[in-house]
């Protein structure tokens, strides 16, 4: 049984999702930590790291380290100034806030796997566990095939769920890149 903890770091909210990897991933626990202020400070960082510890340690035996979940964290892209093919102004505070949360998580858990951003949390609603789809999102007749939206707080947990699902493949790619990288001879 392999457990993966996915984290979607953000300035306004951070999503956390713990899954058991099976042919159909099973959501074991999730949380969304919302930032109550307009800035990313030590209180928010402490709340994020506390929630990660609570979820992570609640699902394995810490005395012998058996079954410890692997961690996958969504990385941050360089800003492009475009969103959905249109010019989009960039809020530097939001980008810096995401980077601060990402840095805090990586400092606390340096063995985390980085997952590239892009598309996380935007799969069809039916691809997510029922806990990650609100009743309002299920109202339309075609809800199951629609791509997940950005209108609810739970979107952060959906993104973390996708990050956790991608963790193993990103870890394999990182290992292969390390093995095939030629180091200069001394």
What spans do the regions from the language model cover?
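Phosphate- and other anionic-substrate recognition elements at nucleic-acid/protein interfaces
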Residues: 1-186
């Amino acid at each position: 049984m392999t457990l993966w903890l996915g984290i979607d770091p953000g300035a306004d909210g951070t999503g956390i999702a713990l899954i058991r990897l099976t042919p159909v991933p099973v959501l074991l626990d999730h949380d969304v930590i919302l930032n109550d202020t307009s800035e990313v400070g030590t209180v928010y960082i402490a709340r994020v790291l506390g929630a990660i510890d609570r979820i992570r340690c609640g699902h394995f035996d810490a005395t012998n380290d058996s079954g410890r979940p692997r961690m996958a964290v969504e990385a941050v892209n360089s800003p492009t100034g475009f969103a959905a093919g249109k010019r989009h102004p960039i809020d530097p505070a939001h980008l810096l806030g995401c980077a601060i949360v990402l840095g805090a998580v990586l400092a606390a858990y340096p063995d985390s796997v980085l997952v590239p951003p892009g598309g996380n949390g935007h799969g069809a609603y039916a691809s997510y566990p029922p806990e990650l789809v609100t009743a309002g999102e299920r109202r339309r007749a075609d809800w199951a095939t629609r791509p997940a939206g950005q209108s609810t707080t739970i979107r952060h947990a959906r993104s973390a769920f996708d990050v956790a699902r991608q963790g193993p493949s990103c870890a394999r790619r990182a290992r292969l890149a390390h093995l095939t990288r030629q180091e200069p001879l001394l």
